């Protein structure tokens, strides 16, 4: 079957294209779509969401290096409040008195908690954001997530000015807000928006462009945020700047960004759901279970599919998921552990942390944009090019990324080539480089040696992440 002719109309046409035209007057609107004016090209929905994504990434990333110092300060204050509250009753503790094993333990626990919360928020947030955006639209949910970011900054400003159990309660509020409105969920919603407003042939390029702007925003923000904190000698200044920038992004989103999932499609989806549940009364337990099922609905994609050519179940996605889980489990600990190590053992300033994280972003761009494509181009001829064809199961075409749009898409059969094992070899090489690089990074003692050694594990991590995405 020709994939081009089998593609659904909703996959081929932007959701913002408007109502269908009649046969008599369909030519002119079609020509306007194919040859848009220069003004419309400058202010397309993709352009608007790209601007929002870049500035959002800049605002949220510039506080990361200062977050490390704030967490260490809060951990020190909590440790003294619990173990020796009479020494510093006001909470103003000199930094030299925080160099204690107990403080380092509190700090490690707090960093681990933020990492775990971020991961859980990514798992639950994507499903919930998909469901809520299918009911209320992409734009309102995006505005809600931006509001959560602003509340998070206010809470971090507050936690620096309270002491004792109020500080602990405020830290708990920060954890809750970051679970709901974390960056992973926001980026996921942006990706859904791009899929809505772009045609099938242009989606890969649009998503790649969004990713590139995200990396650029992060690369600029790390150094900017760390420098603001270091040169102004204030942990609050960067949060005020980030709060203001996020507020501008929220206002821009409210008045400029068009909705990508219009009310007609939401109403149609609501009628489909009512038809499915008509005549079936649900208890509160069943309703709660249904909400949990929506949040975990992306996990259903891991179900093995049947390959009609081989006559066997296709477990490749399950293997990739297991690999991603194991590697991410290690990498998710390695980065916070490295930041804890640099903060507690070498007393890195936010500016130095900014240089380290900037090196991270630059190395990511180098690996994904230059090194990896050249590597594949040079070594691809060495591999056996005789590859078997794989036809996905019929159910694959019906699985939609958005839980609310499963009934809108139709089947698309795609014939793909199986792996020539080059991706497997790149993954193994990345494991080796990353393992050795972290060992070397822990043995060097100077800042510049650590700065030069930092890109090596990230290079391996980017290689591994790209192979997971390609698989």
From Swiss-Prot:
<feature type="glycosylation site" description="N-linked (GlcNAc...) asparagine">
    <location>
        <position position="25"/>
    </location>
</feature>
<dbReference type="Pfam" id="PF07690">
    <property type="entry name" value="MFS_1"/>
</dbReference>
<protein>
    <recommendedName>
        <fullName>Major facilitator-type transporter psiT1</fullName>
    </recommendedName>
</protein>
<feature type="region of interest" description="Disordered">
    <location>
        <begin position="1"/>
        <end position="36"/>
    </location>
</feature>
<keyword id="KW-0472">Membrane</keyword>
<keyword id="KW-0325">Glycoprotein</keyword>
<feature type="compositionally biased region" description="Polar residues">
    <location>
        <begin position="14"/>
        <end position="36"/>
    </location>
</feature>
<dbReference type="InterPro" id="IPR036259">
    <property type="entry name" value="MFS_trans_sf"/>
</dbReference>
<keyword id="KW-1133">Transmembrane helix</keyword>
<feature type="transmembrane region" description="Helical">
    <location>
        <begin position="424"/>
        <end position="444"/>
    </location>
</feature>
<feature type="transmembrane region" description="Helical">
    <location>
        <begin position="322"/>
        <end position="342"/>
    </location>
</feature>
<feature type="glycosylation site" description="N-linked (GlcNAc...) asparagine">
    <location>
        <position position="384"/>
    </location>
</feature>
<feature type="transmembrane region" description="Helical">
    <location>
        <begin position="108"/>
        <end position="128"/>
    </location>
</feature>
<dbReference type="GO" id="GO:0022857">
    <property type="term" value="F:transmembrane transporter activity"/>
</dbReference>
<keyword id="KW-0813">Transport</keyword>
<feature type="transmembrane region" description="Helical">
    <location>
        <begin position="212"/>
        <end position="232"/>
    </location>
</feature>
<feature type="transmembrane region" description="Helical">
    <location>
        <begin position="140"/>
        <end position="160"/>
    </location>
</feature>
<dbReference type="GO" id="GO:0016020">
    <property type="term" value="C:membrane"/>
</dbReference>
<comment type="similarity">
    <text>Belongs to the major facilitator superfamily. TCR/Tet family.</text>
</comment>
<comment type="function">
    <text>Major facilitator-type transporter; part of the gene cluster that mediates the biosynthesis of psilocybin, a psychotropic tryptamine-derived natural product.</text>
</comment>
<feature type="transmembrane region" description="Helical">
    <location>
        <begin position="168"/>
        <end position="188"/>
    </location>
</feature>
<dbReference type="InterPro" id="IPR011701">
    <property type="entry name" value="MFS"/>
</dbReference>
<feature type="transmembrane region" description="Helical">
    <location>
        <begin position="44"/>
        <end position="64"/>
    </location>
</feature>
<keyword id="KW-0812">Transmembrane</keyword>
<feature type="transmembrane region" description="Helical">
    <location>
        <begin position="237"/>
        <end position="257"/>
    </location>
</feature>
<feature type="transmembrane region" description="Helical">
    <location>
        <begin position="356"/>
        <end position="376"/>
    </location>
</feature>
